[in-house]
Amino acid sequence: MLDIIILVVIGGAFGAMTREFIMLMVPPLTDGFPLDILVANVVACFLLGTVTALYARKIHSRDVHTIIGTGMMGGVSTFSSFAYGSVVLASASMSAFLIAAAYVTVSVVAGYVAVLAGMKFGEKSADILHRYPPMASIIDSGLVTVESRHSVAETIERVAAKAKSMGMNVFTRVDHGAGAKEAGLGLPPTELIIFGNPQNGTVLMQDKRTIGLDLPIRALAWEDGSGKVWLTVNDPAWLAQRHSLGLSSDVAIKAMVTGTGTVTKYAAGD
């Protein structure tokens, strides 16, 4: 909770500065119409719609969404300023009251349209970013590899034992080394195990069926040329990005990240 509060405070500070900048750039009209407040609120609505759409498409993390969406946009657009501007404008005269009513109406309608426009812009941006990912995401294959203190066979046994103790299913094991031997080829010890929680996996496939290509979870224990043993697993968070999972998959992905991390740490450790 404290980390969320800190992120909101930081974002709010930047938002307040952004708001002041906008209000300096857009002074009120001569008739007292608070155009500066209106512009600040509409800009905030557009940006909030954009970051929300990007977050739904897994373009940025929850922390980024908190600091920009909740914190910064909350600092840019405040209801208190909107209400104060309306009251001050309405109290001047009857004609000013009508202007105030128009201001309230325009603010609500413009804010609604700005949010929709921002969400559309965010969706289009997400499509482009998914189509042309940054170089870092191309280089990052989504694999997490840790050194194991055990043999390949024992590492896989420890994966199976820990997964079962956490209520997961162990679906199958594939001994690639044995397969290579049958084919008359040489391959250092290499073994795959497939495990997972059908409940979490089903939630993810209900969101995007293509993630079934990467489910259940796969863990590969393998020995390198120097005799060291490694355990490699898919990063669930990367899988969420790969398949463009939405907000409905958040809880299941977090559970998968925690579960995979726990199993990996146990299997490779003491």
UniProtKB/Swiss-Prot annotation:
This is Fluoride-specific ion channel FluC 1. GO terms for cellular component: plasma membrane. Pfam families: CRCB, DUF302. Its main location: membrane. It comes from the Bacteria. Keywords: Cell inner membrane, Cell membrane, Ion channel, Ion transport, Membrane, Metal-binding, Sodium, Transmembrane, Transmembrane helix, Transport. It catalyses: fluoride(in) = fluoride(out). It is a multi-pass membrane protein. Na(+) is not transported, but it plays an essential structural role and its presence is essential for fluoride channel function. Na(+) binds at G74, S77. NCBIfam families: PRK01636.1-2. The chain crosses the membrane at residues 4-24, 35-55, 67-87, 96-116. Fluoride-specific ion channel. Important for reducing fluoride concentration in the cell, thus reducing its toxicity. Disulfide bonds: none annotated. One of its GO terms (biological process) is cellular detoxification of fluoride. GO terms for molecular function: fluoride channel activity; metal ion binding. Gene3D superfamilies: TT1751-like domain. InterPro entries: DUF302 (IPR005180), FluC (IPR003691), TT1751-like_sf (IPR035923). PANTHER family: INNER MEMBRANE OR EXPORTED, SLR5037 PROTEIN. It is found in: Cell inner membrane. Belongs to the fluoride channel Fluc/FEX (TC 1.A.43) family.
